[in-house]
Design a protein with these regions (language model features):
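Hot-dog-fold acyl-thioester-processing enzymes
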Residues: 1-75, 135-232
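A conserved acidic, glycine/proline-rich C-terminal tail/linker
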Residues: 226, 230-242, 251
Length: 286
């Protein structure tokens, strides 16, 4: 079986999304964000819903399905060019930007672009690792009670930006299994490994896991507290290192890497105890 090279340049979409007030409010609640801040402007993390408007079309493509016995979302990048208004139609296009094989894995760069009322709003890329072989089994763990949630801090109001090298205010995060179902409904990411124990075990996981892009949303929320702009984030890039189980407490922390007139760069991490789960960088609008 050959790789996925022949799909480079293939497009999926455009797919329209209607960010109605109710849908945006549902998404804000599902990600634990600030409803007052996002009453008229779509939150940056709504990029997650844009990606999953088109990514399933790629992953369910009959030419791709044989390669999805093992699927890892290893990296994600988003860049925003302007605010998107609640109620303004968002059109999303996905594209296979690159594909190569290495050590039995297919490395695919899946690009996404979105416009709001015809004007560019978002661009980004997801790095997927796909294989025709099933993932190695992990030690199975018992699922926590569906409603068990660790401490989770609301984003709160804006904060003064620290100096270069100084720490951001930590934010405790985590999700219950019910939270994961709510997020799946709000984002369109219905991958069963986030809600069905046996699907997760079959994928080589100990049990259900928190959506990677939900954790990315939490990281973006911390960064966005350091900007009062309607477009608080100019970019966010993350690398997924380990999974987070529901009901496990975690925290987003960060430091100021560089300050400039055009934007402030932040280094971000999401840890669960001593385990580093995600590393990332964000550029915040002054």
């Amino acid at each position: 079986m050959t790789g996925l090279d022949d799909l480079v340049g293939e497009e999926y979409g455009p797919v329209p999304i209607e960010p109605t007030p109710d849908r945006v409010a549902e998404f804000v609640v599902a990600t634990g964000d600030d409803p007052d801040r996002w009453a008229s402007v779509v939150p940056p993390s709504f990029a997650n819903a844009s990606l999953f408007a088109v990514a399933p079309r790629f992953l369910e493509d009959p030419r791709v399905v044989p390669f999805t016995r093992s699927l890892i979302h290893s990296e994600q990048r988003f860049e925003w060019t302007r605010p998107a208004l609640v109620g303004a139609t968002i059109d999303v296009v996905g594209r296979v930007g690159a594909a190569r094989q290495r050590a039995g894995l297919n490395l695919v760069s899946f690009e996404v672009s979105a416009s709001s009322d015809g004007v560019p709003w978002l661009s980004g890329s997801a790095q997927f690792l796909l294989s025709t072989e099933a993932a190695a089994a992990a030690a199975e763990e018992k699922e926590p009670p569906a409603s068990e949630r660790p401490p989770h801090d609301p984003p709160g109001g804006s904060l003064p930006l620290p100096g270069v090298g100084e720490a951001l205010e930590p934010m405790r995060v985590g999700a219950s299994r019910l939270d994961l179902v709510r997020y799946a409904a709000a984002s369109g990411d219905w991958n069963p490994i986030h809600r069905d124990h046996w699907s997760a075990v079959a994928a080589g996981l100990p049990g259900t896991i928190v959506h990677g892009l939900l954790m990315t949303a939490w990281m973006g929320q911390l960064a966005a507290r350091y900007s009062t702009a309607n477009l608080p984030l100019q970019s966010l890039t993350v690398r997924f290192r380990k999974a987070l189980r529901p009901a496990v407490p975690a925290a987003v922390t960060g430091t100021v890497a560089e300050r400039a007139e055009t934007g402030t760069d932040l280094d971000l991490v999401l840890d669960a105890g001593s385990e580093r789960l995600i590393t990332g960088t964000a550029r915040v609008t002054p």
